[in-house]
Design a protein with these regions (language model features):
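Electropositive polyanion-binding surfaces
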Residues: 1-241
Length: 241
């Protein structure tokens, strides 16, 4: 689980990305840790969810719930209006979420809420910089399928381009970029993710391309590479990830 914070620092923004510290609740090598290792990930299906961690942890103690104090790992960075990162700090923290919004609620407040407006502006600028640096933007329909107890099936097309979804996506990408640069700078052992250039480009930059072009562009992407050092990630347009 994760949360965002933002403060004004003159013309710049002090942005915080706070990630729930699961290790504070799960003992290394303990029964829960071993079972989570065996499962590897949570599985989401139209009619059920198989969690990696027990529900009481995943949706309780390990979740950043409004009004509850939770241990976390926080990534703070100062960003200019041009999305340049001036400094960063990664630190253990204790957080209490003030507002818990879903995407629809965040979208409805995107224009009127000062904090959301500031985060959205930073996210948009960072997105444009990534595209200018060669990032590949794949925009395909995102379907949500749910099967209810009575057998009814609900299919929804999610708006992947909504302001709130773009905000969260870009903040997570920015936080991972900052973390990768921090780990590389400190020469700390880590697993980095990179990607070679695609085999071809059907569209570029701010051009979103047609639905067919997006499907074909995805087929032209190179495989992601996991390594022990930072390398260029062409899909994201970043020098480290």
């Amino acid at each position: 689980d994760d949360a965002l914070s933002v403060e004004s620092r003159g013309r710049n923004l002090r942005i915080g990305v706070h990630i729930s510290d699961v290790a504070a609740w799960v003992e290394k090598g303990g029964a829960i840790d071993q079972e989570a290792l065996a499962r590897g990930t949570s599985i989401y299906m139209p009619d059920r969810k198989i969690p990696m961690l027990p529900t009481g942890l995943a949706e309780g103690l390990c979740s950043l719930v409004r009004g509850e104090v939770r241990p976390a790992v926080s990534i703070f960075f100062t960003a200019t209006p041009q999305a340049d990162i001036l400094d960063w700090e990664i630190t253990p923290s204790v957080v209490s979420v003030k507002r818990q919004l879903n995407y629809s609620e965040a979208d409805s407040l995107a224009e009127s809420d000062k904090s959301l407006r500031a985060l959205a502006a930073a996210a948009g600028t960072f997105n444009r910089r990534r595209l200018e640096n060669g990032a590949v933007q794949i925009l395909l329909p995102d379907l949500s399928v749910r099967v209810y107890n009575g057998g009814d099936i609900q299919v929804k097309i999610m708006d992947r381009d909504s302001p709130a979804r773009l905000l969260v996506s870009e903040m997570m990408i920015m936080a991972n970029w900052v973390m990768a640069r921090f780990l590389a700078q400190k020469n700390m052992p880590a697993v980095f993710r990179s990607q070679l250039h695609p085999r071809g480009r059907l569209y570029s930059g701010q051009d979103e391309g047609t639905l067919f072009q997006n499907w074909m562009q995805r087929r032209m992407l190179s495989r992601a590479i996991l390594g022990t050092g930072p390398e260029y990630h062409s899909g994201l347009g970043l020098d480290a990830y």
